[in-house]
């Protein structure tokens, strides 16, 4: 019964990583089975489902995701995050 309740929680199965957005604001990246989640002050501010993610890459301590364009957009967009270290970005 405990596990049944636990898996209903919004943070169940989310692997959290401290990061900063490209403006230097502290955020937390969450990786889970449904996609990549972005939290600020423990509040989810963005969600990127895996089918929308075209490419994941890293360079030094930066981590980038390329997002498939939506219905109204023509081009993919790349979103970057700064992580504490090269190993964290990798």
Swiss-Prot record:
The keyword Cytoplasm applies. The keyword Phosphoprotein applies. One of its GO terms (biological process) is cell division. This is Protein 4.1. GO terms for cellular component: cell cortex; cytoskeleton; nucleus. Binds with a high affinity to glycophorin and with lower affinity to band III protein. Associates with the nuclear mitotic apparatus. Binds calmodulin and DLG1. InterPro entries: FERM_domain (IPR000299), FERM_PH-like_C (IPR018980), PH-like_dom_sf (IPR011993). Residues 1-90 form the FERM domain. Its main location: nucleus. Keywords: Actin-binding, Calmodulin-binding, Cell cycle, Cell division, Cytoplasm, Cytoskeleton, Mitosis, Nucleus, Phosphoprotein, Transport. It is found in: Nucleus; Cytoplasm, Cytoskeleton; Cytoplasm, Cell cortex. Protein 4.1 is a major structural element of the erythrocyte membrane skeleton. It plays a key role in regulating membrane physical properties of mechanical stability and deformability by stabilizing spectrin-actin interaction. Recruits DLG1 to membranes. May be required for dynein-dynactin complex and NUMA1 recruitment at the mitotic cell cortex during anaphase. GO terms for molecular function: actin binding; calmodulin binding.
């Amino acid at each position: 019964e405990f596990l049944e309740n636990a898996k209903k929680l919004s943070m169940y199965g989310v692997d959290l990583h401290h990061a900063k957005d490209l403006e230097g604001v502290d955020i937390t990246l969450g990786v889970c089975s449904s996609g990549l989640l972005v939290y600020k002050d423990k509040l989810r501010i963005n969600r990127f489902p895996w089918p929308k993610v075209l490419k994941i890459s890293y360079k030094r301590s930066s981590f980038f995701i390329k997002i498939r364009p939506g219905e109204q957009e023509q081009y993919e967009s790349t979103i970057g995050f700064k992580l504490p270290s090269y190993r964290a970005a990798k």
